Every structure is written in C-alpha cells, then in structure tokens.
C-alpha cells in the first residue's frame, strides 16, 4: 500500500520515450521540487533575503518599485488564471479519464505549485527584479509545457479522447508563456546590476497619461475624424492580409482545372495587392493613411513642443542656472520627436503586427489543425521573447549613449557661445580635444549598442528560419504522406507566413526604436516633471493701478540650505523714491533685485508691493510693472529694432525710436548701414558693452513701468555717456519707484536712501550726506573711489568734476 501503486504506475510508463504519461512524471517531479524551494523561500523574511541591488537602490527607486506596475499586475492575474485553469483541468480529468495515482499526483502538484508561486510573487512584488527561485520555477514550467510537442502526432490526435486535453494544454501554454514573459523578461536583467530604472517600460501608464492629451487632437474635430479613418484603414488592411493567401490557394487549385479557371480571382488578388503594397510600405491604403496622418503628427509635435517650451519658461532662475542650455535643447528635441515615433510605430506597426499574429494563429488552428497553429504560435512567442529580452538588456547602453550625446552637445554649444573667450586665451586646441574626447566616449557606448544589435539580429534570423523550415516540412508531409492538404494549401501556408514574417523582421528594429523613444521621452518627462519653484497661488490677483511703494520685511534667502545670502533685511521705499544698494561683490545686491522681481521665492520674510505680499499677485502682472536693466545684458540674435521693442511688443516704430533717443543710442543706430535693422549677433556680441546696455535701457524706457530696477546699468559706459544717461535715468525715475545697484557711488549720491550691504546684511543706511557723516563703511568706499578718480584725472590731464 502507500506509494506502491504510484511507483508501479511510474515504472510502467517509464521515462523514455517521452509521451503524455511521461510528461506527467517529469512535471510531477519538477513541480514537487519547486514547491519545496518556494515554500522555503516564502518562509524567509524580506529583510534577510533582499538582494544587493534592492539594498543599493535610492529612496526614489525604492518608492517607485513599491508600486504595482502593469507587468506585476498582469503577472498576478495570469498566475491566478493558471490556478483556475488547473482546478478546471482537475475536474475535467477525473470526470472523463480513469483514476490513477499518477494523474492525481500530477494535478495536485501542479495546483500547489501555482498557488505557492502566486504567494511568493505577492510577497516579493516590491523587489525591482524577479526572485531567482521564481525565475527558475517559471522557466522550468515553460520547458515542461513544451515536452508534449516532442510527440505531437500521438498527443494531439484529433480523433482521440485527448481532444479536451489539447484544449486545456493550449490555454495553459499561452498562460504560462505570458507569466514567463512578464516575470522573467521584465525583471530578470536587474540581477546583472541594473537598477529598476533600466527598463524603459517602467511607469508606462504614467507616461501614457502624460502624453495622451497631446496625441488625441481634442482641439480639432476634423483631426479626430482623420484618426478614426486611419484606424478604419488599419482594419481593412488586416482583412486584406488574410484574404490574399486564401486567394493564392484558390488560384493554384483552380490551375489544376484550366478549363474552369476563374480570371476574376487573379484580378481580385492583384487589386488587393495594390491596396496592400509591400507590407507596411508602398500600398495605396498606407499612402492614404500617411497623407491623412501628417496633420495629426504635426498637431502632436506642435502641442508638445509649445507646452514644454512654456514649462521651461515657467521654471525658476535657480533651475536655469544649474542646467546647460545645449543639453536641455537636445533633450527637448529628442523628446518631442520620440512621441511621434512611439505613436506611429505602435499604432501602425506593433498593433497591426500583433493583430496579424493573433489572426494567423486562429486561422491556422481553425482552417488547418492545431499543429500549424502551434508552429506559428511557438515561433512568434520565441521571437518576441528573445527580441524583448535582449532589447531590454540593451536599454542601459542606449541610456548611457543618450547621456554622453547630451554632454557632447553641451560642450559644443558652450564652446561656440564663448567663442570670444576661447580666442582670448588661445584655447582652440584645448576645446577641440575636449570635444573629441566627448565624441570618443560616446562612440565607445555606441559600439556596444551596435554590437548587441548585430547579436540580436542573428538570433532573430535563426528563429524565423527555424520556424519557416519546420512549417514548410510539416506542410509537405501533410501533402505527400497524409494526403490531407493540396498544393494550394502549401502556397497558402508559405504565402501567409512570408507575409507575416516580413513585418516581423522589422519588429525587432521597431521595438528598439520604440524603446529608445521611451528613453528619450523619459528624459523629456524629467524636464516636464521638474517642479515650478515660483508660481502663482490659486487666489492670486492681477496687480493693477500700482501706487509705487515697496516694503521688505525680515527678508531671508538662501540658494543652498543653511547658507543664507540675504539675512533678515528690512526697508521701505515710497512712491517716486529711489533706493541704492551698494557694497562689495557677493554682498547680495543682485540677489535682492531678483527677489524683488520674484525670480526666486524668499526663504523667510516677505516683500510687499503697495502693502500686499507679492505672492498674492500674479507674476505676469507684477513683472509688467517692473522694468529692469541687468548687470550683464544679453540680447537676442535679431535686429536692434526687435531687441528694443521686446520691452513692449505692441509698440510702434516711432515709440521705439523715442526710447532709443532717451537712452542716447539713436544716433549710433542711425549711423549703422542698416540702421534699426542691424543684426546684433549671438547674445549681442556685435555691439559693445556700452551699446548693449543702452539698448537694454531703451527697452526698459519703452516698457513704461512703475518700478525701475537698475543693476549697475551704467557700469560699461564711458564717463560722458554715463553722466548723460544718469540724468536721463534720474528723470525717468522721478515719478517712479527705483532700486539701483551701483558700484560707482557717484551715480547714487541723489538717492533717497542708500543701503550698504555686506554678506547679506545691512551695515548702514541713510542718504549720501548722512552716511558720510557716520564715517563708516560707506565713507571709506567714497573716499577710496574719489582718490581713484582723482588719480585717473591727473594721469589723463582732465579736470575732476
């Protein structure tokens, strides 16, 4: 008694040759082994069994992996479906088949295997990768499900009582393949040291939700109709793909009886081929679809680029100071094009290809028999698994190549922008070598991507070749020996498979392009997800009818935590008054100007305009009331007219000219060959420093703001021009509130209030006479500048003003 009947049944069946019963013995052994392994692993606490990759993860990665991804949810659902299928199979088997101990052991072990697998998977769902025990368990499960294929003729005999077994087998094979794909392919490569971020498919649902508004043209009904019609053309294309091989079979079979040959079949096949073209290219349907899709693609690009550009302008000055412009533009360019690539390839290549595969499997199962369906299904499953697995592994090289490409672009951009500096120090060779080293570093990573691509192509061709040979041999066998198929069926099979494999040959390339696009899009999302530091509050109101008062109360600001640049500053400015900020470099003068303009948010304290905190005003309305001339004036690479009019884009030419006259640059402009149409060059490099600042002053005058902020606005001017512009600025600020940052104290002697800053605090305050009387820091600075100016005047033989 005991195990004797079971052992007797196993001895009777034997392990060779492999057959349905032998499969049960092997499966029972494999299932039992992994039941023990999974049970032991299931009893191990999480803290002791977490792999090194998981321990090395950052907090951000850990929080991201704690969420259930789509692949994990699908894996759990599929494993649960396998459990349900096993229960149904258990009931079916003991209802239609005679009871044996071996059959009972097989069914029970399989059921417990999948139940423990589900428990193990649920326990380790927060890991970035599949636990090794589950990886081997699911791999073994997939292998033992392939054992019956070695004796397919006996096992799948259509007339035998195994018809029900065949149905359950096909369902379970499909489910196990899905489980293997989602648990092994999407997680196994993390064991090689890749973080969970390495997969471009991570956070796929979040990416889709973010991009969806730019894909569906919500603003245009006509574009929506174009999308619907393009989808309709895709459906027509799938029907044609099924019809053409069938027509080929009919034509070949009709040729066996030439007297009754129907030429209409030939004409119909030719017409359908004209509509279909060469796979995904060249056909009439694809030409029409491409024509219809162009405006949709342009809509997506336009909406996404505009939104991203708008977002970049909404980010704080702190963000822009910490980024390289060339790198940002490169990410923006690749990211926007990647969205169109993803949309085109998924909608017009991936979805149709998968649909064709599903239709082909169903067609061969129904029109031929299960053998043909399994050949197509097995080849497709193996091809897709290998393609996706190796491509996922290649993602790390693609991402690394992108980073090095960004770095190369940033080096080139910075070097060309600073062309003049490079020439000053004779560092052309140094810059060329730096650029060369960046390219060489990029090409090392590029070689890895190309070499791994060649390896993948080799495997893909091998899989497709094996599938074609196996299918063709089987068709010939059915024609020659079984006499159940005709020559037309051979033509149908080969035509259909060649038609199916043609787009599949490009599937690997398409998948790689899509994955690279996801990586590019991921970098773009990093930009789009950067938090806007300075933004309008929900209840912010427009700043209208300004009275011109500013109140700074206990203001503190720090760029880096714990290192304040401005420390507890307080002062008030009345309407029409001018406050001057003086002090040594790095004392916080320019930072205070930026805080008043709300380029940064204060760390502590408040800034009030007309008694209301600036955070209660909308930024646009507040900044419209402020005119600022920065210390380092940067102009657009456009005309002088454009740069001055930038202060108020709706200003007329006459108003622009009046502003230029007020800034004392009109005569200089008119002396140029092209006058106001003169191009100023990149960053305004064609103009001198003084000319650039006068252009900046002109556009500030044109803006007609209530508040004037001057950040050493006359520092680059010669003495006569400085005196003339100073009078102009004094006149401009007479009825307006002004804040002036000055290095030359002679330019602020008439200020209503002078604040002497040092290391972010106010050392002294008062007007010019009061500060001189204090005999403090300001008086020392004044005496030093007077002595310096007197020495220069004596040297040049000029009279001291």
Curated annotation (Swiss-Prot):
One of its GO terms (biological process) is cadmium ion transmembrane transport. ATP binds at residues 583-590. Residues 227-516 form the ABC transmembrane type-1 domain. Residues 46-75, 123-129, 189-226, 286-341, 391-461, 511-801 are cytoplasmic. Expressed in coelomocytes, as well as in head and tail neurons, and in the intestinal cells. Its main location: membrane. GO terms for molecular function: ABC-type heme transporter activity; ATP binding; ATP hydrolysis activity; cadmium ion transmembrane transporter activity; heme binding. It is a multi-pass membrane protein. Keywords: ATP-binding, Endosome, Membrane, Nucleotide-binding, Transmembrane, Transmembrane helix, Transport, Vacuole. GO terms for cellular component: early endosome; late endosome; membrane; recycling endosome; vacuolar membrane. Disruption phenotype: RNAi-mediated knockdown causes hypersensitivity to Cd(2+) and exhibit Cd(2+)-elicited changes in cellular morphology. Even at the lowest Cd(2+) concentrations they arrest in the early larval stages and eventually die. The intestinal epithelial cells of hmt-1 RNAi worms upon exposure to toxic levels of Cd(2+) elaborate punctate refractive inclusions within the vicinity of the nucleus. Residues 1-24, 97-101, 151-167, 248-264, 365-371, 483-489 are lumenal. It is found in: Vacuole membrane; Early endosome; Late endosome; Recycling endosome. Residues 550-784 form the ABC transporter domain. CDD domains: ABC_6TM_ABCB6, ABCC_ATM1_transporter. The chain crosses the membrane at residues 25-45, 76-96, 102-122, 130-150, 168-188, 227-247, 265-285, 342-364, 372-390, 462-482, 490-510. InterPro entries: AAA+_ATPase, ABC1_TM_dom, ABC1_TM_sf, ABC_transporter-like_ATP-bd, ABC_transporter-like_CS, P-loop_NTPase, Type_1_exporter. This is Heavy metal tolerance factor 1. It comes from Caenorhabditis elegans. The gene is hmt-1.
């Amino acid at each position: 008694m005991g195990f004797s009947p079971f052992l007797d049944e196993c001895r009777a069946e034997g392990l060779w040759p492999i057959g349905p019963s032998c499969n049960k013995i092997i499966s029972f052994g494999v299932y039992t082994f992994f039941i023990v392994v999974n049970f032991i692993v299931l009893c191990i606490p999480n803290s002791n069994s977490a792999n090194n990759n998981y321990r090395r993860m950052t907090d951000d990665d850990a929080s991201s992996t704690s969420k259930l991804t789509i692949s994990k949810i699908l894996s759990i659902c599929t494993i649960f479906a396998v459990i349900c299928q096993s229960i149904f199979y258990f009931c079916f088997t003991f209802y239609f088949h005679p009871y044996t101990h071996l059959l009972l052991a097989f069914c029970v072990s399989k059921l417990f295997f999948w139940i423990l697998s589900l428990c193990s998977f649920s326990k380790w769902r927060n890991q970035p990768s599949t636990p090794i025990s589950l990886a081997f368990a699911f791999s073994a499960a997939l292998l033992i499900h392939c054992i019956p294929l070695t004796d397919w003729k006996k096992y799948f005999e259509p007339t035998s009582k195994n018809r029900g077994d065949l149905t359950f087998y096909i369902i379970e094979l499909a489910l196990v393949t899905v489980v293997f794909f989602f648990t092994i392919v999407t997680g196994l490569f993390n064991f090689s040291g890749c973080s969970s971020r390495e997969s471009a498919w991570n956070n796929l649902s979040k990416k889709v939700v973010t991009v969806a508004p730019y894909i569906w043209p919500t603003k245009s009904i006509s574009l929506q109709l174009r999308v619907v019609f393009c989808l309709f053309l895709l459906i027509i294309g799938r029907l044609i793909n099924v019809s053409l091989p069938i027509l080929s079979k009919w034509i070949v079979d009709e040729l066996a009886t030439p007297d009754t040959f129907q030429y209409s079949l030939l004409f119909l096949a030719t017409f359908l081929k004209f509509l279909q073209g060469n796979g995904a290219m060249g056909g009439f349907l694809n030409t029409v679809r491409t024509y219809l899709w162009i405006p949709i693609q342009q809509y997506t690009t336009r909406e996404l680029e505009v939104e991203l550009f708008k977002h970049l302008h909404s980010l704080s000055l702190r963000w822009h100071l910490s980024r390289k412009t060339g790198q940002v533009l490169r990410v923006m360019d690749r990211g926007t094009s990647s969205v169109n690539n993803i949309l085109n390839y998924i909608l017009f290549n991936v979805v149709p290809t998968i649909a064709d595969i599903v239709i082909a499997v169903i067609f061969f199962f129904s029109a031929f028999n299960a053998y043909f369906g399994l050949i197509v299904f097995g080849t497709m499953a193996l091809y897709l698994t290998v393609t996706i697995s190796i491509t996922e592994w290649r993602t790390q090289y693609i991402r690394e190549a992108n980073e090095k490409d960004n770095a190369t672009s940033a080096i080139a951009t910075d070097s060309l922008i600073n062309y003049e500096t490079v020439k000053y120090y004779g560092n052309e060779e140094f810059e060329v070598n730096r650029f060369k080293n960046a390219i060489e570093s990029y090409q090392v990573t590029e070689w890895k991507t190309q070499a791994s691509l060649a390896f993948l192509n080799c495997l893909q061709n091998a899989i497709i070749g094996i599938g074609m040979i196996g299918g063709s041999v089987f068709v010939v066998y059915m024609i020659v020996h079984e006499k159940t198929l005709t020559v037309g069926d051979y033509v149908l099979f080969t035509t259909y498979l060649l038609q199916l494999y043609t787009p599949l040959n490009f599937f690997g390339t398409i998948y790689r392009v899509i994955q690279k696009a996801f990586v590019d899009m991921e970098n773009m999302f990093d930009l789009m997800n950067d938090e806007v530091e300075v933004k309008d509050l929900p209840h912010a109101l427009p700043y209208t009818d300004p009275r011109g008062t500013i109140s700074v109360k206990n203001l503190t600001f720090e760029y880096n935590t714990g290192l304040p640049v401005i420390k507890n500053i307080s002062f008030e400015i009345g309407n029409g008054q001018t406050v001057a900020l003086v002090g040594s470099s790095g004392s916080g003068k320019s930072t205070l100007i930026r805080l008043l303009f709300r380029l940064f948010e204060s760390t502590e304290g408040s800034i009030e305009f007309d008694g209301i905190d600036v955070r209660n005003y909308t930024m646009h309305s507040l900044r419209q009331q402020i005119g600022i001339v920065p210390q380092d004036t940067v102009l657009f690479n456009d005309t002088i007219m454009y740069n001055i009019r930038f202060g108020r884009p709706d200003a007329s030419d006459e108003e622009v000219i009046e502003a230029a006259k007020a800034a004392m640059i009109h005569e200089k402009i008119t002396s140029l060959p092209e006058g106001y149409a003169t191009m100023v060059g990149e960053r305004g490099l064609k103009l001198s420093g003084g000319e650039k600042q006068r252009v900046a002053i002109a556009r500030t005058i044109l803006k007609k703001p209530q508040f004037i902020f001057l950040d050493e606005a006359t520092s680059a001017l010669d003495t006569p021009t400085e005196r003339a512009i100073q009078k102009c600025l004094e006149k401009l600020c007479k009825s307006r509130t002004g804040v002036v940052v000055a290095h030359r104290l002679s330019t602020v002697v008439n200020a209503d209030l002078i604040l002497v800053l040092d290391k972010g605090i106010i050392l002294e305050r008062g007007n010019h006479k009061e500060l001189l009387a204090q005999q403090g820091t300001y008086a020392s600075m004044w005496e030093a500048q007077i002595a310096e100016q007197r020495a220069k005047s004596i040297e040049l033989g000029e009279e001291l003003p």
